[in-house]
Amino acid sequence: MTSRIELARVDLRGRTPSTAELRAALPRGGVDVDSVLHHVRPVVEAVRERGAAAALEFGEKFDGVVPATVRVPAAELARALDELDPAVRAALEESIARARRVHADQRRTDTTTEVVPGGTVTERWVPVARVGLYVPGGNAVYPSSVVMNVVPAQTAGVGSLVVASPPQANFGGLPHPTILAAAALLGVEEVWAVGGAQAVALLSYGGTDTDGAPLDPVDLITGPGNIYVTAAKRLCRGLVGIDAEAGPTEIAILADATADPAHVAADLISQAEHDVLAASVLVTDSVALADAVDAALTAQLAVVKHAERVRTALTGKQSGTVLVDDITQGLRVVDAYAAEHLEIQTADASAVAARVRSAGAVFVGPYAPVSLGDYCAGSNHVLPTAGCARHSSGLSVQTFLRGIHVVEYTEAALKDVAGHVVALADAEDLPAHGQAVTVRFEALS
């Protein structure tokens, strides 16, 4: 018999905590990346010094397998696609089509502003030249992460893509065949059988494969991973760009008495099954709903495949129910929490959702569960965690673009503003800056 699940409760009714107090009171887990940096730094340094040879040694140590080459042969990509379950292939094709439709509308166009007659500034959008897309192994297989990383990069016009995913002992040192098939379906030709911190380091520094072929370094690394991947990203940031330091997945649900407790429970469980550190948070003004959700969690947990993992996540310090006076207070709570995934299951859900200011993605109403966004909504599921949605966005076409300002001024336009340039340069005690302008209009003495 399954023991009853009762989410820990934080009661904010009748209180008006400050923002700092609110953030401190809310359930929050996360991981301490600093605690593993001393383990990861030697891995990164070894790969920097010895390239693929070091990465393969760490792969043997951590994954228990050494691939014949880091780069997966093209024949293996083709074979994985040929052998892919037809239902999974159809689902991936639908996911790709929807993601491409959404991300196509994110393309940026160059803009030119005439500041003054003869003086223009153009913002030109240029894709990152080469990108490394990390797809984790671990508790599950994530072909959907291949889609979510590759589609915006391709849409942005990135010319060179490499997917890195851990080698699997069960598959002869290759990444999981579903990962390979997804890459092939997207037209990705370069996949590396390397995972963990050593993958991030090899993507950053490059090296030489066992067959002598070059493994070119990338300019940007995206994609989620465990704490060691995150630590390696931190250590390599600057040498390469990174999308974010991803933490455990999280869902917050803002719900009132109109919500179906079975739906709320199912959605909380769906994210809890990712990881024992996953966060599932309910914010509600209805004690009756909170009680009903606890009962529904208990009932559903009895038939969930990964019951122990889910139970551990739901009963961890990162999960719980927050009781509020009303939906307005609930909105303040969810904005302070800044969830990776936020569901709105209230009356007039669209109007409530329009008031949200901090969330990685918002799922509105009873028929937009987070699972839809994970796979087939068309939105991207690589989203900011650990409260970073207060200042950061999810993966998009913009992630893979750089805006370059192109400044063009005629002689007359420069002469017209020269006095202002000189005044500001002198105010900052940088007279050579002003001289670089005036020299164009007067002879040197």
From Swiss-Prot:
The active site is at residues 340-341. Its EC number is 1.1.1.23. Transmembrane segments: none annotated. PROSITE patterns: HISOL_DEHYDROGENASE. Disulfide bonds: none annotated. One of its GO terms (biological process) is L-histidine biosynthetic process. Binds 1 zinc ion per subunit. Zn(2+) binds at residues 271, 274, 374, 433. This is Histidinol dehydrogenase.
